[in-house]
Amino acid sequence: MVSFDATEALAPYREGRGYGAILFDRERLRQADASLFSPQSWGDRARPVDAGGRGGAWFVDAPFGHSVLRQYLRGGMAARVSRDRYLWKGAGRTRSFAEFRLMRELIKRKLPVPRPLAACYLREGLGYRAALLMERLENVRSLAEHAQVAGRGAPWEATGQLIARFHRAGLDHADLNAHNILFDAGGHGWLIDFDRGVLRIPATRWRERNLKRLHRSLLKLRGNRSREDVDKDYARLHRAYELAWGRGY
């Protein structure tokens, strides 16, 4: 359950034959329009993000701070039908609005996530497109990068503790992989990409599903490292997770 937030503002808009709305943080943005979500409107202040993901993301140097713009794109077989359109099920169930509100709820629970700034959808017929604008985390490296460079020296224990903290708060992360776990220069961990994430009562089944997905991600990204080495690193992560979970954080 995500609570009501009085600092949210909603702005409807029309574009071509479609209509949509923008949900934004009025403490950070005085107003919002559709140009916020167009890389072309930012010109040379927007540059593509090339690490992980399916594309459709840009670093933006905005007047309100360094940001990341992400357009929601499909992967796998679904992308053959439509790369960027989703079935309309109501404004509150759009991918962008749901992720925006989930991130704000996680921040209220004092969890380390980037601050969402604005989310939009544009509905046309039975489908819609969506995008999300959020603050950019500076001077961070993903767990994937740490693993490739440092191997056994990567922050395995810190990663396990970080995940346990989010799980204790009830976050079921839909795509927990090594690209979505970041560490800043001070060694502080962050999670990103909460698309399709939900808050649940903590339970073993979905927690282990998250962890197994991360394990598969590490194996996929192992490069020249042996599976045995990756499994040993993951075992360190999992032990730290279990210890942190047992302590209640």
UniProtKB/Swiss-Prot annotation:
This is 3-deoxy-D-manno-octulosonic acid kinase. It catalyses: an alpha-Kdo-(2->6)-lipid IVA + ATP = a 4-O-phospho-alpha-Kdo-(2->6)-lipid IVA + ADP + H(+). Pfam families: Kdo. Pathway: Bacterial outer membrane biogenesis; LPS core biosynthesis. It is an enzyme of class 2 (transferase). GO terms for biological process: lipopolysaccharide core region biosynthetic process. Signal peptide: none annotated. Belongs to the protein kinase superfamily. KdkA/RfaP family. SUPFAM superfamilies: Protein kinase-like (PK-like). Its EC number is 2.7.1.166. The active site is at residue 175. NCBIfam families: PRK01723.1. It is found in: Cell inner membrane. It is a peripheral membrane protein. InterPro entries: KDO_kinase, Kinase-like_dom_sf. GO terms for cellular component: plasma membrane. GO terms for molecular function: ATP binding; kinase activity; phosphotransferase activity, alcohol group as acceptor. Catalyzes the ATP-dependent phosphorylation of the 3-deoxy-D-manno-octulosonic acid (Kdo) residue in Kdo-lipid IV(A) at the 4-OH position. It comes from Xanthomonas axonopodis pv. citri (strain 306). Keywords: ATP-binding, Cell inner membrane, Cell membrane, Kinase, Lipopolysaccharide biosynthesis, Membrane, Nucleotide-binding, Transferase.
